[in-house]
Amino acid sequence: MDVLVINGPNLNLLGTRQPQFYGHKTLADINNDLLKIAKENNINIDFYQSNHEGQIIDKIQQTAAKIIIINPAAFTHTSVAIRDAFLAINKPFIEIHLSNIYNREEFRTKSFLSDIAYGCIFGFGPNGYTLALIEAINYINMKGE
């Protein structure tokens, strides 16, 4: 596998949950958009969503992906364990958020992942996933993997 896309808690509710922040696209819509781009670029992509921190950590530890795109959602601001999982596997990842976490409540402005991420994309709604995938493809091509 080339790219793993991980979505954290409550992202299974996209399309209906706080559309003023997250838009009207569902997670399935976003995944379908990414799948089309991946196919056009001969990239193998897999998708995973969980509301449970430990399951996300297990997925990070077990993946054979060359690069990970993650929207950790609320775990962004709380999970030292997810941070430690990324440090343990030593693989590049791109942190993504639909909303700009720096334009939200104060507690949402701290990310436990940003400083160790290959890159971060915040505030572009569902298009942020597309931007992340394009950069993941660029990374794979740059590394010649």
UniProtKB/Swiss-Prot annotation:
Catalysed reaction, written as an equation: 3-dehydroquinate = 3-dehydroshikimate + H2O
Site-annotated residues for Transition state stabilizer: R17
Full protein name: 3-dehydroquinate dehydratase
NCBIfam families: aroQ (TIGR01088), PRK05395.1-1 (NF003804), PRK05395.1-2 (NF003805), PRK05395.1-3 (NF003806), PRK05395.1-4 (NF003807)
Pathway named in the protein's UniProt entry: Metabolic intermediate biosynthesis; chorismate biosynthesis; chorismate from D-erythrose 4-phosphate and phosphoenolpyruvate: step 3/7
Name of the gene encoding the protein in the UniProt record: aroQ
Residue ranges the record marks as coiled coil: none
Family statement: Belongs to the type-II 3-dehydroquinase family.
Gene Ontology molecular function, alphabetical: 3-dehydroquinate dehydratase activity
Its EC number(s): 4.2.1.10
Keyword Zinc: no
